[in-house]
Amino acid sequence: MGGVYNGDGGTCHRGNIPCPLAAQMKTGEVGRQLYELNMHTGVFSHTVVTSDFEAIQVLYAHRNQSNLLVMEILLKRIKTSAEPITIQLESSFKPQSEDIAFQNAPDYKGGRHIFGQTASSEVPGGVRPVVHLIWTPVTPTLTLPANQSQSSWTFLVAVARSNESAQSFYDSGLALINTGDLRPSHQRSWAELWKGSSIEVIGAESLNRALIGCMFYLLGSFPYVNKEASAAFEFGGVSPGGLSNGSEDEDYHGHVFWDQDTWMYPSIALFYPALARAVLQYRVETLEGAQVNAQQMGCKGLKFAWESAVTGVDVCPEDVYSQQELHINGDVILAFQQYYYLTQDLELFQSGRGSEVVWGVADFWVSRVTWDSADQQYHIKGVIPPDEYYFTVDNSVFTNAVAQRSLEFAVELSALLAEVPPPAWQDIADKIKIPFDPELKFHPEFDGYKPGNKVKQADVVLLGFPLAFPMSPEIRRNDLEMYEAVTDPLGPAMTWGMFALGWLELGEAEKAQKLLQKCFKNVQKPFQVWSESADGSGCVNFLTGMGGFLQAVLFGYTGFRVQKEQLAFSPLLPLDVSALSVKGVCYLGHKMDWTITSEEVKVSVRKTDSKETFTLQVVLNSGSTLLLTPGQSVSFPRQPGHICQLKSSSSCWPI
């Protein structure tokens, strides 16, 4: 359950909550067993087919009743018979947890009820979450009476932080059962979600399945938001293994890392601005904890936790990461910047406290850098780069570049809000050291890095994307070649997608596709679940890897780049992909559907009820401009260009 952790400091982990629906269906007869995960409807089913009957067990977490879990059983005769049919439900559920001291409460409307509080809080004197469970008791047997053709049973679990909320969700479930709308309402919500976004390729079926799987697992990890629902709900962020993983000493304890902001967020933000804002709101809610982290380091401003739970105070079990993996600050600000460029939603930065986040991080960098009089540059010493094979290095090129980017956005935001920024922000951004080897024309990972030394994962290549750090194609190529050759083949799953994206930037689609194929080693069949490492080890249901893979296609094949005052594109498809369809791209209040082939690009703008949208145009590198009208489409020969707001001068801001 989101936001429920047990343990203090480095022992903090996701609280283990027992599931009353943990039951296996047994028929007592030999039959054909079928298991299916329908990613379009969000339903998992187990079907047993015998010569006499069919038994179907269906499980789902309700999409818009987000605190409800549901199990349905259907028994259906195949042959007419006067004999009853009985199946067993073998339950492994025990109403107890090593993290939560559960106790019984009075039954509620036929449902069992337990509640309990976690054993300890993540910080001294902090809140210990309370959890309530109300559920329909699962009987050990179910019987289809003689002479009855079929029958069904529904079992509910409502889980919430208060008695009132648990009862309310349970009531909602009962009401939906009575109207026959329990599963249909869940499936409608998933249908609406898929209508909001999809990525589909023609010509590469395994790639298509992987993309659908990545979208499904990512969307299933983010909260339900619609036009009527506010983003001001309890959302505890997304951890690398999602909600179902993260107990003690497992899958990063369920903590939130840069994985959320750098790897999962960009694709979500391009499709669902409301979900993107929920991610940013999580960081706003941990602002006070980030302040504590900075103070404990002897710095000013905000230091976001390398491993975050509810309070934002760092709960990483090893202090060295908390103290040195500073790039998390820049990663968070990059997410805020991307959101603003996609939406121009200044309210988040005004009344929504987003400006406090951006400016607090800028103040941190000011207090953390040191001035080197010899080279007349600012240095950031003693850090861990994204490549965690190295500790206590100086001037990690990614760390310094993302710090520069966050300082520049702090200055930009000040102008937008009519505030005067401290001069130090721009001064440090202008003079921070970005390691570069002028002889070999590449970016060393940090001061003293020796070419040929092994690296863990994508690091320097992130300068090109997502940072868009200015460099020539020659230098971009050198960085890709230098680090591709020395990257650990068993490193984390998101790595090769970033190399593929880099080669697509340089127009080498086939080289990119070979690297993208490496990602399939992390995809575990039959349900497209990702492992952290190519050998199947590491974090299970590795959302970080899925996010990196999605970005490789979504931003690689299309060339989408979220820039100031424009959404740039430069489409390029590999030979085994004849067409790419990307539906639901959100930009400045509009939703666009894109179809890309080797010859042509088609952009359709959906009609909208909103009056607070901008008029958009396509500006092509050839010099042509095309007006984007809601409800209509435009087509043009495949080439680079950008989408921007139509202004009286018919021009766009420079980048």
Curated annotation (Swiss-Prot):
This protein's UniProt keywords: Glycosidase, Hydrolase
MF terms (GO), sorted A to Z: protein-glucosylgalactosylhydroxylysine glucosidase activity
Catalytic residues, chain numbering: 388
InterPro entries, alphabetized: 6-hairpin_glycosidase_sf, 6hp_glycosidase-like_sf, Glyco_hydro_65_M
UniProt catalytic activity: (5R)-5-O-[alpha-D-glucosyl-(1->2)-beta-D-galactosyl]-5-hydroxy-L-lysyl-[collagen] + H2O = (5R)-5-O-(beta-D-galactosyl)-5-hydroxy-L-lysyl-[collagen] + D-glucose
Documented EC number(s): 3.2.1.107
GO cellular component assignments: cytosol
Biological processes, Gene Ontology terms: carbohydrate metabolic process
Coiled-coil parts of chain: none
Residues that bind substrate: 258-259, 456-457
Family to which this protein belongs: Belongs to the glycosyl hydrolase 65 family.
Function description: Catalyzes the hydrolysis of glucose from the disaccharide unit linked to hydroxylysine residues of collagen and collagen-like proteins.
Protein name stated in the entry: Protein-glucosylgalactosylhydroxylysine glucosidase
Source organism of the structure: Danio rerio
Native organism taxonomy: Eukaryota, Metazoa, Chordata, Craniata, Vertebrata
